[in-house]
Amino acid sequence: MISEEVFSSICGPPIAANTAISKDVGVYAHSLTPSWTVKSSFKKSSTPVHCLALSDSHVFAAQDQKAHVHVYSRLRGNQESLVPFQERIKCLALAGDVLVLGTVEGRLILWETCTGRQVTTPPCHVQAVSCIAVSPHHILSASEDSNVNVWSLAHLLESGQDVGLEPDRTLSNHRAAITDLVLGPSSNPETNLCVSASKDKTCILWNYLTGQVLRTLLFPTSPLCIALDPCARALFVSSEDGNLYLVDFFGDKPLLGSRSAELASIVVQVNSPLGVADEEAGSASCLSVSYDGTSVLTGHTKGKILKWNLVDNSHPTELANLNASVTNMIMAPLLRGKASSQTVTVVKPNQAQRQYTLTAQLEGNLSSNSRFDQMLNSKGFSPETIAEAIASLSAPSSGGSDDMDLKRQNDELREIIKEQQALQKATMERYAEAK
């Protein structure tokens, strides 16, 4: 049975003198289904909000008020290395094998974990980078200066382009610091979606490739953390007053698409919450949606992890109490993507390196070519492809039983026609005799 796994992190001192919870553990790996259990843990980490990233082989955790990133091996279950940087890290995200870090000085640092190559941008924001979101082709960095910068990942990683890097565009409709940023799964220029939350009590839906504002949502209090439904059909928002909101994009009154009745410039007021967390839980600092989109997990400042069941809309249930502020919750993918290599040990960044060396473990048999590779490298159609085509055209039809059934039906239809013709002939003869 496939098990959903969620990673959580904590930051700050213990809330209560609870001896049942280890004080050294900073990152937890929980099993969500079929039952909630702690599968593994990683020690000596204090990870603030937006400072946890996850790959198939490693866990990356930036440390609070420090310029360090702790790298943990998921395969070995221990801390692999401590990676220092020149500036304090405010947030991070993982784009494939590239770890993207935002600093308090407003810069972006890109670290290729398989090569050690490091790319640093100029100060792209006036204030600290508060959160980062990545897609297969783009990086979005949000800041306390209320702006969101859209970067091309390929352009940032282009060799010899460490100086003079600038974002492709800037999204600047917010009037206060941005608290969270999420991307939809689509990379199509017409259907890509980005949602930013801000202390100005709004969430803005963007087409981040064009910079178009698709919709502005206004809440009673400031949204602290947001998450999209797995299919980007709805937005989950947790605000500073403990309320959890569900905004349906394609409901009775669609907010997006051609069926939307209102102009994109019209602000939508969101007043009715899906539920309210108990006061002793505190406000939510992180939010995660299950793989099937039927439940929501929230991590709170008082150490509790709550599960909201969307099927029956019941009161949230407490899954765990980590005895410290829960700052990050990341759902691990159910199925690993097919990759030809795996990072067993990360290569620490080195700005002075002159050689580009890739360090990875190859997986599978790389010597055997696929059918596509064989067709691509052959001149015209390969002999095997031509032979298969000739065989498929010359082979006798496999539907012999179907042909016999059709022949039988045709014979029955001919008999019926003959009977009708004989009946018509007899009727006409009687009609002629009657005249």
Regions found by a protein language model. Give the residues of each.
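Terminal intrinsically disordered, low-complexity extensions flanking WD-repeat/beta-propeller proteins
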Residues: D252-S285, G303, V311-K435
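Loop/turn segments within WD40 beta-propeller blades
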Residues: I2, C51-H58, L92-V98, G102, ...
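An edge-strand/N-cap motif at the start of beta-rich repeat modules
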Residues: M1-L32, V59-F60, L99
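A short helix->beta-strand "capping" segment at the edge of beta-propeller domains
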Residues: V27-K43, R76, G164-E166, V268-L274
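A structural motif specific to WD40 beta-propellers
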Residues: T37-S40, N78-S81, R117-T120, S159, ...
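Conserved strand-to-loop turn within each blade of WD40 beta-propeller repeats
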Residues: C11, Q63-Q65, G102-E105, A142-N147, ...
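WD40-repeat beta-propellers
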Residues: Y28-S31, V69-S73, L108-E112, V148-S152, ...
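WD40/WD-repeat beta-propeller blade N-cap
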Residues: F42-V49, V83-I89, P122-V129, L171-I178, ...
